Amino acid sequence: MGSTGNPNPWGTTYDSYRDCSQGVCSVYCPQWCYVIFPPPPSFYLDDEDDSSSSDFSPLLIALIGILASAFILVSYYTLISKYCHRRRHNSSSTSAAAINRISSDYTWQGTNNNNNNGATNPNQTIGGGGGDGLDESLIKSITVYKYRKMDGFVESSDCSVCLSEFQENESLRLLPKCNHAFHVPCIDTWLKSHSNCPLCRAFIVTSSAVEIVDLTNQQIVTENNSISTGDDSVVVVNLDLENSRSRNETVNEGSTPKPPEMQDSRDGEERRSASLNSGGGVVSIADILREIEDDEESAGVGTSRWVEEGEGEKTPPPSGSAANQTNGISNFLVRSSMAAMKRSGYDRAKNYRLPK
C-alpha cells in the first residue's frame, strides 16, 4: 500500500496495470469496472416506462369501452325511435287516405230531382234522415260488446278508425254482417255519413231492407197525398153536380114542360158527375174544368133554343135570387177549383192527375 503522505496512491499501485487484457479494473480499463460494479439504474428512463404503462392501464381501457358502448346504444335508440315514428306517421297518413278513398268511392250521389214517379232510391238515408249515412235509431240497434282479450271473439286488437288498441271491458260495436269491431264513438261517427264497414266495405243493411223501407215511405207519402187531395176533388165533383141541378131547377121555374134537349143535357151531366164520383181511378182537375165549361155552354144553348122554339111564350132569363144563386155557385166552384189546384201543386203543362 502507499504511504499516507503520498497524494496519488493509485499512481504507483496501478501503474503496472495499463494492459487491459488482464481484466483488472483501472482507470485505463473502465469496462472491467462496469462488469464488477454495475451502474445504477437511470431514473429518467424509469419515469418514462411508468408513464407509458399507466396510459394503457386496464381501467382506462374499460372506461373507454363503456363510454363507446353507451354512445352506440344511444345512437341506435335514436335511430329506431325516428324510424318507428316516421313509420307510424306514414301508417296514419295511409289509413286516413284509405278512409277518404272509401268515403269518396262509396259516397252515393242523388238522382234527378225531376223524378217524381216514387221509384226506390238507394241513395236516400234509411229511416228518412238526410245524407248518405244510417239513421240514428238504426245505428243504436247494432250490437254492443264488452271487449275481453281472452275470449277471442274479436279478431283484431285495435280500432281501424282511430288506430288505438282495445282496452279490457271496453264497449265495442260489432257490425252485423262482417263482425268487425270498432269503438262506439268512432263507428257511430262513421255510420252517420256512410252505410258500410270501414274495413271490408260490406253494407250494414241489405238492399232488400232498403227497398222495404223506401217502399214503406213511398206508400206513406202516397196515402198522405191522397188524403190531402181526395177531399178537394170530391168537393169539385159535388159542386159540379149541384151546379147542373141548380141550372136545371132555374129553367124549370117557368111551369113549362122540359124540352128533350134539356132532359138529355141533364142526363148527360148527371152521368158525367156520377162517372166522376164513382170512378175507381183518378180525377183530373183539367177535365173537371173542361166539363164545367161544356156544361155552361150546353145549358146556355139549350135554354135559348128552347125559348126560341116555344109556342110564343117568352120566358125571361132567370133573375133575382135564382140568378144570384147560380152565379154564387159558379164563383164558389171556380174558387174551390183554384184552391184545389194550388194545394195539390197543379200544373197545366204537366197535367198531374190527383188520386180520388
Swiss-Prot record:
SMART domains: RING (SM00184). The chain crosses the membrane at residues 60-80. The keyword Transmembrane applies. It holds the Pfam family zf-RING_2. It catalyses: S-ubiquitinyl-[E2 ubiquitin-conjugating enzyme]-L-cysteine + [acceptor protein]-L-lysine = [E2 ubiquitin-conjugating enzyme]-L-cysteine + N(6)-ubiquitinyl-[acceptor protein]-L-lysine. Pathway: Protein modification; protein ubiquitination. InterPro entries: ATL1/ATL16-like, Znf_RING, Znf_RING/FYVE/PHD. GO terms for molecular function: transferase activity; zinc ion binding. Residues 261-273 have a biased composition (Basic and acidic residues). It is a single-pass membrane protein. Keywords: Membrane, Metal-binding, Transferase, Transmembrane, Transmembrane helix, Ubl conjugation pathway, Zinc, Zinc-finger. This is RING-H2 finger protein ATL51. The lineage of its organism: Eukaryota, Viridiplantae, Streptophyta, Embryophyta, Tracheophyta.
